[in-house]
Amino acid sequence: MKVLGLIVEYNPFHQGHLYHINKAKQLIKPDVTIVIMSGHFVQRGEPAISNKWTRAGVAIKNGIDLVIELPFVYSVQSADYFAQGAIELLAKLKVTDIVFGSECGNINIFKDIAFTIKNNQKNYDNLVKKQMNQGLRYPDACNQALSILMNKTVTTPNDLLGLAYVKEVINHNYPIELHCIKRTNDF
């Protein structure tokens, strides 16, 4: 059975979200589609524009079979913790595929970066700490460490979040296939 997992906020739901749902379903052809959605507060700790029940209802009306709330402790955190909570839930739900939107649109780039970090974790962590000790914020320190390790950076919001999803799946060896859809101006 194919079970598609999407990680969303729908704050508010727009045409890009509908595009994401339709494109993901077209790609995976799932038997069931599940979303993990933030509750009354979204990733940056801001209150959602509309309540979680309204947003869940919109998701169901637009082809989602099941909406699961991402616990508050994860939903208001940085990309890494947001991804940790969402991916763990999807793994427990036995999701077979995850599709996310990204600016780069190339899942192999994310996998390459995630495996490089995993295989050089101690060095990467030390580089991040060093950069933070020099005054960089955590996301910037991670990017600088990545630049030193691989001569690559990930700077756009959806690419950062997508990389966090991929790292989480790879680091825990979850049996989940990862896919990304290139974002357009409409998505």
Task: Give, region by region, the residue ranges found by the protein language model.
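Receiver (REC) domain switch/active-site residues of two-component response regulators
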Residues: 31, 65, 96
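A glycine-rich helix N-cap at a beta->alpha junction
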Residues: 57-71
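Short, contiguous strand/loop micro-motifs
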Residues: 8, 42-43, 59, 73-74, ...
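Divalent metal-coordination and catalytic microenvironments
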Residues: 14, 59, 166
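Active-site cores that bind ATP or allylic diphosphates and position pyrophosphate for catalysis
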Residues: 69-187
